[in-house]
């Protein structure tokens, strides 16, 4: 498993413990006490490092090559998943996957950004950066879900919508804007979960819902830290400083009222234990459905409207104002 820069002390100590255990197997000497001391030291070191992650550390975890994707969570959380393809206008976009599934026996529609696991798959899925047809496919599935009264669950994980010439010619901005407009008025429950990177309008195209949750080490922002640094300081190398200033972590966004709940991650990140991570997401989905249970369609839309009208409201000297 690929290790991140800030994890090196942990990796080195793990390797030392492993080497000592291997040596003990082929030796008459007893190193059990030394191993116990090192394992205790490792526990404390992991607690210190993973319990005090910096913003840039979380950015790296969110981008980890082995971080679970939408399809990974679909496999662990849902049954009878049937993937649907195409937007019925241009083509199919592999950067967004979606279809019909069952969640604990209840029919649902599941949609999400999809990155690749290796170079070949990343090229096929355009590194998780959707074209307009991806967003139109997602909207087609959402309207289908509304027609058949199925709740919608969206998994968000993209650096952003694809900014290429062909995507712009096919109406990238219109496709995203249309999704924002239509999702705001859907008469079925919509749960959105940021599982990795939530980048710019590319994330928002699947991000209008009744509840917005984020995994503990995911990020959600209007632009990547590198992009912000390049604009502000003409130096993408200052991405760490930009990340600190942008308020892109789950904790920051929970405090600002942009998201509703933070879903805990396995120590070291979701990629360390996908079964445990899936359980954590499962618990949050169950809790959210309980909160949405019994709400009428009119009330659902009204509460969704109120939710988004509150975002951006701040207070100075006890006087509320709107940021415009």
UniProtKB/Swiss-Prot annotation:
Instruction: Write down the Pfam families for this protein, in alphabetical order.
Output: ACCA
Q: What is its EC number?
A: 2.1.3.15
The protein's name in its UniProt record? Acetyl-coenzyme A carboxylase carboxyl transferase subunit alpha
- Report the catalytic activity: N(6)-carboxybiotinyl-L-lysyl-[protein] + acetyl-CoA = N(6)-biotinyl-L-lysyl-[protein] + malonyl-CoA
Its pathway, per UniProt, is: Lipid metabolism; malonyl-CoA biosynthesis; malonyl-CoA from acetyl-CoA: step 1/1
- Primary role: Component of the acetyl coenzyme A carboxylase (ACC) complex. First, biotin carboxylase catalyzes the carboxylation of biotin on its carrier protein (BCCP) and then the CO(2) group is transferred by the carboxyltransferase to acetyl-CoA to form malonyl-CoA.
Please name the HAMAP family in this protein's record.
Answer: AcetylCoA_CT_alpha (MF_00823)
Residue ranges constituting the CoA carboxyltransferase C-terminal domain according to the UniProt record? 37-291
Gene Ontology MF terms in the entry: acetyl-CoA carboxylase activity; ATP binding; carboxyl- or carbamoyltransferase activity
Native species of this protein? Bacillus cereus (strain ATCC 14579 / DSM 31 / CCUG 7414 / JCM 2152 / NBRC 15305 / NCIMB 9373 / NCTC 2599 / NRRL B-3711)
Gene Ontology BP terms: fatty acid biosynthetic process; malonyl-CoA biosynthetic process
Gene responsible for this protein: accA
Q: How does this chain assemble?
A: Acetyl-CoA carboxylase is a heterohexamer composed of biotin carboxyl carrier protein (AccB), biotin carboxylase (AccC) and two subunits each of ACCase subunit alpha (AccA) and ACCase subunit beta (AccD).
Name where it's found.
Cytoplasm
InterPro entries, per database record: Acetyl_CoA_COase_a_su (IPR001095), ClpP/crotonase-like_dom_sf (IPR029045), COA_CT_C (IPR011763)
Sorted UniProt keywords? ATP-binding, Cytoplasm, Fatty acid biosynthesis, Fatty acid metabolism, Lipid biosynthesis, Lipid metabolism, Nucleotide-binding, Transferase
What GO cellular component entries does it have? Answer: acetyl-CoA carboxylase complex
Predominant location: cytoplasm
